[in-house]
């Protein structure tokens, strides 16, 4: 293709309405009983070089039919095959290796061949009546980050469909999640990824799944039959429907920033080098840390992301999107996605990691990094300021912070408490990573202390706080301290403004045996330890009460920066490792008129000045009771060691 054609194609892609352009570009297989039409957008393919192959199996065997595709006038290639092809498989080949295309919607085992299915056949009974759980504000979300296999694979889970989508449809699983109180599950990758051999599921295999292969097909290893293209689709929908009936939203982990590899990717085998960024010296850029980075700023990649997000919403009823390494993507694309989603349903929440894993071959000021979040209207980002203020830096598992009783992180925590907005009582010169506020509203901050990346909370606490692993200290005392600190950590998360987020299993003091990066660790490391519910019942009870406390009180869920500045005031304090604030003048907002929250990270009880008055104690020394644990009066209170104190006035 000459330069003039490239320019015209780029201009056309920019000018044409996104929906029309995407539909023309990415609708690669159109099935009917009478015929199936195949269309591939392959602008650089040479004349008479695009081959369509049809197979009877999803893997193995020779093609029973081979056709040369005809070039259309707009750099697309077309072939039509008469007859009912349902149940057959196909590949495209432009001379770079066979591929199911960039936008396959059904595939065979291991995702190497596209599958010809009638998607209506994959809808479970009642799917047309499936309803997205209501959501007034992102601040009302309680996000639970979950790996499908982790949740149910343990022999102690008591679930039938271990490691499968269907485990999340079983009554025991649903009741557990409802009892905990979460209302949104962020699933780690559930698209078809390359790092699990679906033909060897008799052999234990594990991977988080951040290895994209087919972006628009559910992963087959979580289905009861990965050889059946329709099964993975139907069972995924059954899972979504069961969660929706339980009032739980489903959030999709969108890993558009890289592919598993380059040469074997569907992008590269369809339009070589187009979908990836390169450095000035012609090498593939690696802002993802995975060997490549995609070029979201290019028209076709942008359209691909838009159409993919829309497809997961339309076909699978997805309720939110978490963008992996969002900082690799450009601001314009992320904003286009937000605007498109707003037209579908503005309650669909979008957030992501406001960083990359390396240097990107694109100007930083144009990337969706955390520092540019204020340009991303209605898109949230993870607060590493808050995370590291509590537990210590990402770069050193053994370095603690406030939870270890170490000082100097108070302002960073305060910045997290207000939801990353500008607040007159937060000294930005003392905040961890940001010297300017990066959100306009608290709903643009994900508040958290741990996630799937690096150590889980229990392991991190043990690695950074010596007394938790000191064998000279009786185990009962060590366990009691671990529980105190763990509860304190999550109290900070759930009583802060923003969108609270927890790693699944932390409510039962889940650990990963100290493994820092368990992306491919065996089940013995990653699986839930369900027996912990009997071992540490007070942990689950506290998490449940904490979640309910937040749900019951809108004061912890203020939706705008102005409301936070109006109602949240920090208490004066000259002591270290002690942070307190009041939510005041809440008439018309909350049943509690004034709320006092104090976090004591010290190993000794501490006293703090509060506005003089009579208060009911709702949380004290690791116990929550909204009806009241007692009463205090005056202008000074004592806070137990390594715990939170919550008081209120009606």
Region spans (language model):
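The feature marks proteins involved in alpha-glucan
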Residues: 23-37, 68-145, 150-163
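Carbohydrate-binding surface patches
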Residues: 34-44, 569-611
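Bacterial Sec-dependent N-terminal signal peptides
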Residues: 1-24
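Conserved, mostly hydrophobic/aromatic
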Residues: 40, 92, 146, 187, ...
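Conserved alpha/beta catalytic core and glycan-binding cleft of carbohydrate-active enzymes
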Residues: 114-117, 121, 338-339, 347-509, ...
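Catalytic cores of secreted or luminal carbohydrate-active enzymes
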Residues: 534-560
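C-terminal beta-strand-rich structural cap/linker in extracellular carbohydrate-active enzymes
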Residues: 42, 86-90, 629-650
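Substrate-binding/active-site clefts of carbohydrate-active enzymes
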Residues: 147-171, 175-316, 326-345, 349, ...
């Amino acid at each position: 293709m000459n330069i003039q054609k490239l320019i015209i194609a780029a201009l056309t892609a920019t000018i044409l309405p996104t929906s029309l352009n995407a539909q023309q570009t990415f609708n690669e297989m159109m099935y009917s009983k009478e015929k199936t039409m195949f269309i591939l957008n392959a602008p650089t393919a040479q004349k008479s070089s695009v081959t369509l192959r049809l197979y009877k199996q999803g893997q193995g065997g020779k093609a029973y039919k081979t056709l040369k595709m005809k070039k259309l006038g707009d750099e697309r290639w077309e072939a039509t095959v008469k007859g009912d092809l349902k149940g057959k498989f196909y590949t495209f080949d432009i001379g770079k290796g066979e591929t199911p295309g960039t936008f396959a919607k059904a595939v065979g085992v291991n995702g190497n061949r596209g599958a010809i299915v009638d998607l209506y056949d994959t809808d479970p009974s009642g799917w047309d009546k499936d309803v997205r759980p209501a959501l007034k504000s992102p601040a009302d979300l309680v996000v639970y980050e979950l790996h499908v296999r982790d949740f149910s694979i343990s022999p102690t889970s008591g679930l039938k469909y271990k490691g499968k989508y269907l485990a999340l449809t079983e009554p025991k699983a649903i009741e557990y999640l409802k009892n905990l109180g979460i209302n949104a599950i962020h699933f780690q990758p559930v698209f078809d990824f390359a790092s699990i051999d679906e033909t060897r599921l008799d052999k234990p295999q594990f991977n988080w799944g951040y290895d994209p292969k087919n972006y628009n097909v559910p992963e087959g290893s979580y289905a009861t039959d990965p050889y059946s293209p329709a099964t993975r689709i139907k069972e995924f929908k059954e899972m979504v429907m069961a969660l929706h009936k339980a009032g739980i939203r489903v959030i999709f982990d969108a890993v558009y920033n890289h592919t598993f590899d380059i040469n074997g990717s569907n992008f590269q085998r369809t339009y070589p080098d187009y979908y990836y960024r390169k450095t000035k010296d012609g090498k593939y850029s690696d802002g993802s840390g995975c060997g490549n980075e995609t070029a979201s700023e290019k028209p076709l990649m942008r359209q691909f992301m838009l159409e993919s997000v829309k497809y997961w919403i339309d076909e699978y009823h997805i309720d939110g999107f978490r963008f992996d390494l969002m900082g690799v993507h450009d601001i314009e694309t992320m904003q286009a996605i937000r605007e498109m989603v707003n037209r579908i349903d503005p309650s669909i929440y979008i957030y992501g990691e406001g960083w990359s894993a390396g240097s990107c071959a694109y100007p930083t000021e144009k990337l969706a990094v955390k520092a540019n979040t204020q340009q991303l209207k209605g898109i949230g980002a993870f607060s590493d300021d808050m995370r590291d203020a509590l537990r210590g830096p990402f770069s050193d598992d053994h370095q603690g912070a406030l939870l270890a009783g170490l000082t100097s992180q108070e302002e960073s925590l305060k910045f997290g408490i207000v939801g990353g907005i500008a607040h007159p009582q937060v000294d930005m010169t003392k905040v961890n990573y940001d010297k300017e506020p990066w959100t306009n509203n608290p709903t643009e901050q994900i508040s958290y202390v741990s996630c799937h990346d690096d150590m889980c909370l229990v392991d991190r606490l043990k690695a950074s706080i010596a007394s938790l692993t000191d064998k000279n200290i009786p185990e009962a005392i060590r366990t009691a301290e671990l529980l105190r600190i763990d509860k304190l950590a999550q109290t900070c998360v759930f009583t802060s403004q923003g969108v609270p987020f927890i790693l699944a299993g932390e409510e039962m003091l889940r650990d990963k045996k100290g493994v820092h990066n368990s992306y491919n660790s065996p089940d013995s490391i990653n699986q839930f330890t369900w027996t912990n519910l009997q071992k540490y019942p007070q942990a689950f009870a506290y998490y449940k009460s904490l979640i309910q406390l937040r749900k019951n009180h809108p004061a912890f869920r203020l939706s705008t920066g102005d409301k936070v500045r109006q109602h949240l005031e920090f208490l004066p304090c000259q002591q270290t490792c002690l942070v307190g604030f009041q939510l005041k003048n809440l008439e018309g907002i909350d049943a509690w008129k004034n709320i006092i929250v104090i976090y004591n990270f010290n190993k000794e009880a501490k006293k703090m000045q509060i506005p003089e008055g009579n208060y009911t104690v709702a949380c004290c020394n690791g116990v929550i009771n909204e009806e009241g644990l007692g009463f205090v009066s005056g202008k000074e209170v004592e806070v137990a060691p390594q715990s939170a104190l919550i008081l209120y006035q009606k």
